[in-house]
Amino acid sequence: MLCIKNGRIHDAVHREPYTADILIENGKLLQIGTDLHAEQTIDAAGLEIYPGFVDAHSHIGLDGYGEPGVDINERNDICCPQLRAIDGVNPMDESFVYARSAGITCVCTGPGSANVLGGTFTAIKTAGTRIDDMIVKKEAAMKCAFGENPKRCYASKCDSSRMTTAAILREALMKARLYLQKKEAAGDDVFRQPAFDMKLEALIPVLRGQIPLKAHAHRADDIFTAIRIADEFGVRLTLEHTTEGHLIADELAKTGLCMAVGPSLNFATKVEVRNKSWKTPGILSHAGCHVSIITDCTVIPQQYLPLCAGMAVKAGMDPFDALRAITIHPAEHIGIADRVGSLEAGKDADLVITDGSPFEVSTTVRRVLIGGKTVHAV
């Protein structure tokens, strides 16, 4: 049992921080209170304690050095929902070291946006040597993409317009729906079962509402296309990037969707991101949207997630909303808020101890715990 004493707690639940002790046992937060004791003690007097930071949209571990190490996109099939991030993530990627040293304890990582359907994202902790032991949620979402990326990557093959992108996604979902109907109608009769199709099997969890479509969409019209298609098929949806979200904030607030905003700490290298703004997270949050801030690592190095939140605060976002945008909101976004994202009894003991606000570049991360074990200390 471990007790962290006298730290100033920012639990991502209560707006105002408070001084308390944290009791940890078997990798879980056992209790938060005063006058707690354990065999092992960490003195956090004068320090700040936060939940481990969570990134809802990353590609960490899939984008290595040079072409031999790049596993982020399948370049020969525009529709490949059968791919799984867990089969490509390299836990030995040094980006994980940088991530946890900055307090990022959990990420949702997966395929890029070259394909209309790219495969499943996985939610993992940032410490470990074997991906199977790092998993929080094996299949967190099914990646789909709109806008420039599928067009650019497949322009000479099969996709040169936004209309084509939408049609390819619709066709895949229609085929998967028919496939599922045949499977359910056949029941246990193996002779009536449709021929096995790995791609269509991969889309069944989407149709059953077990995982959402994770829709890469920057431009406002692409965002609305993603919403339109999700509504047509009655499937769950999260919005990823949401670059022009500030232009349609009131409309997005009506949807109740989870939306991830970023990457913002980079050049506007594409036409569809020319309206990128640090004000976007704050505007969406103020409108009542459920907002997470993301790095899209390796577009932005994973360790700069708190800095991105700080830039959003500088542009007008409420600091408490910004904290929630890198803790409990991304945890809810990817469906793992029962385990991570806030400092509450029963959750994983993932926490960050700092000597100041994580939004300030002068702040030092003093200690990081994942599952109650120290993975970084200075």
Language-model region placement:
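Metal-coordinating catalytic core of metallo-dependent amide/deamination hydrolases
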Residues: A123-R228, E232, T298
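C-terminal cap of metal-dependent C-N hydrolases
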Residues: K5-D11, E332, E344-V378
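Active-site core of metal-dependent hydrolases
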Residues: A85, L180-S277, S292, E332-I334, ...
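N-terminal metal-binding scaffold of metallo-dependent hydrolase/deaminase domains
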Residues: M1-H37, L47-I49
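Divalent metal-coordination and catalytic microenvironments
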Residues: G7, I22, G27, G46, ...
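Alpha-helical scaffold segments that flank or form the walls of functional sites
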Residues: G69-L117, A127, D159-A185, D189-F191
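His/Asp/Glu-enriched, well-ordered alpha-helical/loop segment
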Residues: Y65-G66, V70-R75, C80, P212, ...
